[in-house]
């Protein structure tokens, strides 16, 4: 069984008259959420979004919300006996996620499209659809926890650090959090999720996990960008910090901050890393590893989840995470407005890149205090 909140979902009425829309990607996580809720007697409605043309070149096997996954979600619904609907969100997804993804790379940034998808599609349009279906709440298969605090629902990291998805969900607003449920957040491991899937006889119990960037075939994001923005891979110069030309690159979109391999400028002594991208000059700037060291990070579009307003203090002591694969580090937030701040990392980080998220956590706690987008000018 899932944890106690799922037995009631926080509503003072029987499960049979509590409608829950489950966002079903076709993977094992959201399938288990739907199956557990259905088994507990809730009025479950499964919804899967078709986010792109799964017959076109952008689709790939094992990608979230592609043709196979829609089929798998439907099979789970049939197994558990609840209705399932497929909604065509291709245009919305392209406008809200894919176009910005391509434009960000053209601007020399390294975007995180999964965050934008949660923010602009799943927790916006799909959540509104759930309300239109008279649902009491919407449940997803994300590994994150929703806990009740003194001021209302709070967002907390998942119990399993290896599966925690809080970095990708920092932009969840208090209003959205009031309507959302995350039944898997308390589980200790993915093995528990698969065991629940097997217990329910779900056809996806052994299905491999999907890739993060669902619309990028084989991880070749540059190929996708070139299809969306012809001419995006114009070659240019690789230069060092003094401006000396060291070689030629294949297009700025092929490079990210901190990259060392694949530069094609070997034999120059000490290893060189990409420290900056200048798309206007079509330059890739490289330097020694110490040139990547960053302590001051400008952050904008902040979604603040603390109980007191962000600007109520001149400084906030937090733990900050500047990449999804890195652990949170000690930091100080210095607000500039309700949505902008300067974040000082107590210990420098390498490879801080525009387009990534900077997510804030309460010191000594699992609570997510919000986050924002890293902007140019990190130093």
Swiss-Prot record:
ATP binds at residues 23-30, 49, 141. Keywords: ATP-binding, Cytoplasm, Disulfide bond, Nucleotide-binding, RNA-binding, Transferase, tRNA processing, tRNA-binding. It catalyses: S-sulfanyl-L-cysteinyl-[protein] + uridine(34) in tRNA + AH2 + ATP = 2-thiouridine(34) in tRNA + L-cysteinyl-[protein] + A + AMP + diphosphate + H(+). The active site is at residues 117, 214. Its EC number is 2.8.1.13. It comes from the Bacteria. Disulfide bonds join 117-214. GO terms for cellular component: cytoplasm. It is found in: Cytoplasm. One of its GO terms (biological process) is tRNA wobble position uridine thiolation. GO terms for molecular function: ATP binding; tRNA binding; tRNA-uridine 2-sulfurtransferase activity. Residues 163-165 are annotated as: Interaction with tRNA. SUPFAM superfamilies: Adenine nucleotide alpha hydrolases-like (SSF52402). The record marks 142, 356 as: Interaction with tRNA. Belongs to the MnmA/TRMU family. Catalyzes the 2-thiolation of uridine at the wobble position (U34) of tRNA, leading to the formation of s(2)U34. PANTHER family: MITOCHONDRIAL TRNA-SPECIFIC 2-THIOURIDYLASE 1, TRNA 5-METHYLAMINOMETHYL-2-THIOURIDYLATE -METHYLTRANSFERASE. This is tRNA-specific 2-thiouridylase MnmA.
């Amino acid at each position: 069984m899932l944890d106690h909140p799922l037995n009631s979902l926080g509503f003072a009425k029987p499960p049979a008259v509590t409608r829950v829309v489950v966002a079903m990607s076709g993977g094992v996580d959201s399938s288990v959420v739907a199956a557990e809720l259905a088994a507990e007697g809730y009025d479950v409605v499964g919804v899967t979004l078709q986010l792109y043309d799964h017959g076109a070149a952008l689709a790939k096997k094992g990608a979230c919300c592609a043709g196979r996954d829609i089929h798998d979600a439907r099979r789970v619904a049939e197994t558990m006996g609840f209705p399932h609907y497929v909604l065509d969100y291709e245009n919305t997804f392209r406008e809200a996620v894919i176009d910005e993804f391509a434009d960000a790379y053209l601007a020399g940034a390294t975007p995180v499209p999964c965050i934008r998808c949660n923010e602009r599609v799943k927790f916006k349009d799909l959540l509104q659809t759930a309300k239109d279906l008279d649902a009491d709440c919407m449940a997803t298969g994300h590994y994150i926890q929703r806990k009740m605090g003194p001021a209302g629902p709070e967002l907390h990291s998942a119990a399993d650090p290896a599966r925690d998805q809080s970095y990708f969900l920092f932009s969840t607003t208090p209003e959205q959090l009031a309507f959302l449920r995350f039944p898997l957040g308390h589980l200790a491991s993915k093995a528990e999720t698969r065991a629940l899937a097997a217990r329910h006889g779900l056809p996806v119990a052994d299905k491999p996990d999907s890739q993060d960037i669902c619309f990028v075939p084989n991880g070749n994001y540059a190929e996708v960008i070139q299809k969306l923005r012809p001419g995006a891979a114009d070659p240019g110069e690789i230069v060092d910090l003094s401006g000396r030309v060291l070689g030629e690159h294949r297009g700025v979109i092929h490079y990210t901050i901190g990259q060392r391999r694949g530069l094609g400028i070997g034999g120059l002594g000490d290893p060189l890393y990409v420290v900056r991208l200048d798309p206007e000059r079509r330059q890739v700037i490289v330097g020694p590893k110490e040139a990547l060291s960053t302590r001051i990070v400008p952050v904008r579009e902040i979604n603040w989840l603390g109980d007191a307003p962000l600007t109520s203090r001149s400084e906030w002591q937090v733990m900050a995470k500047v990449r999804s694969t890195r652990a949170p580090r000690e930091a100080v937030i210095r607000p500039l407005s309700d949505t902008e701040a300067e974040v000082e990392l107590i210990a420098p980080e390498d490879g801080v890149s525009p387009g990534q998220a900077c997510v804030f956590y309460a010191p000594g706690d699992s609570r997510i205090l919000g986050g924002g987008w890293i902007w140019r000018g990190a130093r």
